[in-house]
Amino acid sequence: MVQHRFLLVTFPAQGHINPSLQFAKRLINTTGAHVTYVTSLSAHRRIGNGSIPDGLTYAPFSDGYDDGFKPGDNVDDYMSELRRRGVQAITDLVVASANEGHPYTCLVYSLLLPWSAGMAHELHLPSVLLWIQPATVFDIYYYYFNGYKDLIRDNTSSGTNNVLPCSIELPGLPLSFTSRDLPSFMVDTNPYNFALPLFQEQMELLERETNPTILVNTFDALEPEALKAIDKYNLIGVGPLIPSAFLDGKDPSDKSFGGDLFQKSKDSSYLEWLNSKPEGSVIYVSFGSISVLGKAQMEEIAKGLLDCGLPFLWVIRDKVGKKGDDNEAKKEEEMLRCREELEELGMIVPWCSQVEVLSSPSLGCFVTHCGWNSSLESLVSGVPVVAFPQWTDQGTNAKLIEDYWKTGVRVTPNEEGIVTGEELKRCLDLVLGSGEIGEDVRRNAKKWKDLAREAVSEGDSSDKNLRAFLDQIKVLKDARH
């Protein structure tokens, strides 16, 4: 049997690298496929060297920002250069591989890279989108560009703190959405105007295909309605894309994503500290790899943690200044007024292995920005959540967490957009307390943990979906010969 050869192209950001690398491992382990992993040179340099599976090779290219995208860089210039250089690099790879007698079977690409699909079409190479956000978010974008734009814009252009009394319903989705539940790129005040045209380009490309398959980092039981909401698209759940050691245990050595674009804390004593705490007692606080909170918000979080009185592990990344600043790296925790009190009660680290932290029995709650990777990791680990969304898909994820999966409670900011210490403590007390809400979220967290692990078991939904996709690719490949 001829081996599948995949070209997997990923946007160079932490939230894209991690699930796509895990998908590469899944492809290799499921069928013995060969995967060539393509991303920028700056991202590749930060990918760990440990446990690279047989069948995975890297093909990094220069996007013109080999030291990474820095604050102060122009995002439109960056995206333009990434596209121009990426098209050339991937074209060269595809042509060279074909000339050597080892043509690629399929190109798989992540969000924000719709030009990859256009280029693959020109090269007569099948392509498929790896959607690394929930299926619900895909559906919302689809509806935005297919008849619901005015309705959505009308509901996101006014209101106090983006919370409106009115809500909208979208076909096939089980929840109604207010402004704060929708992806932030749709909001009039969204400053990241580069993103929405890329999603529009993506949807237009899919429209040209007949019943295209879209691989989604979710699983059937998690989003049954959203996966089936759009008849003309074949959305299939292939997730959760989480390291095997923390999911199905098939590969105990697979303990990290491998794509950690930030330096992990050199001092792993936080794991020993975690393990010394009583079961279910520790609050873990992390806002991911991109979000930067203002000093006022940081102070309120500190106040809420201190008032709660439970041990906590708080990830505060080193803040990188603009190029040319004398103080390029600043430790934000040093600016907190109550730093000494915080360190008496908890532990502050610049980065950590999140999947390891969440798997610790001492974890009682995860205060999270609700990035999709973090949301899935909390589900897989069975850890209840205080949802503290910031931007992009996170408001939608928080809505699903609180109202659909019911594994957490969402904070409500005040009129200035700040989540007060009192509000954070209120949510922590609900999630960690012995009342009905606390009992419900803990019970639901356990339920989804079991269902997530079941989904990737051999013969279950995500495993079957991936194998069906590979059979589909084989048919396409045979038709080309």
From Swiss-Prot:
InterPro entries listed in its UniProt record: UDP_glucos_trans (IPR002213), UDP_glycos_trans_CS (IPR035595)
Enzyme active site: 16 (proton acceptor)
pH-activity profile: Optimum pH is 9.0.
UniProt xrefs under Pfam families: UDPGT
Temperature dependence comment: Optimum temperature is 40 degrees Celsius.
The reaction(s) this protein catalyses: phloretin + UDP-alpha-D-glucose = trilobatin + UDP + H(+); (2S)-naringenin + UDP-alpha-D-glucose = (2S)-naringenin 7-O-beta-D-glucoside + UDP + H(+)
EC annotation from Swiss-Prot or TrEMBL: 2.4.1.-, 2.4.1.185
The UniProt record lists the keyword Signal: no
GO MF, one annotated term: quercetin 3-O-glucosyltransferase activity
Keywords associated with the record: Glycosyltransferase, Transferase
Tissue expression remark: Highly expressed in young leaves, at intermediate level in mature leaves and at low levels in flowers and fruits.
PROSITE patterns: UDPGT
Membrane-spanning residues: none
Residues reported in the UniProt entry to bind UDP-alpha-D-glucose: 354, 369, 372-374, 377, 393-394
Binding residue positions for an anthocyanidin: 16
Catalytic EC class: transferase
Chain's role: Glycosyltransferase that possesses phloretin 4'-O-glycosyltransferase activity. Converts phloretin to trilobatin (phloretin 4'-O-glucoside), a potential antioxidant. Can convert with low efficiency phlorizin and trilobatin to their corresponding di-O-glucosides. Can convert with low efficiency naringenin to naringenin-7-O-glucoside. Can convert with low efficiency quercetin to quercetin-7-O-glucoside.
PANTHER family: GLUCOSYL/GLUCURONOSYL TRANSFERASES, UDP-GLYCOSYLTRANSFERASE 75B1
Family membership noted in the UniProt record: Belongs to the UDP-glycosyltransferase family.
This protein's name: Phloretin 4'-O-glucosyltransferase
Organism: Malus domestica (Apple)
Gene that this sequence comes from: UGT75L17
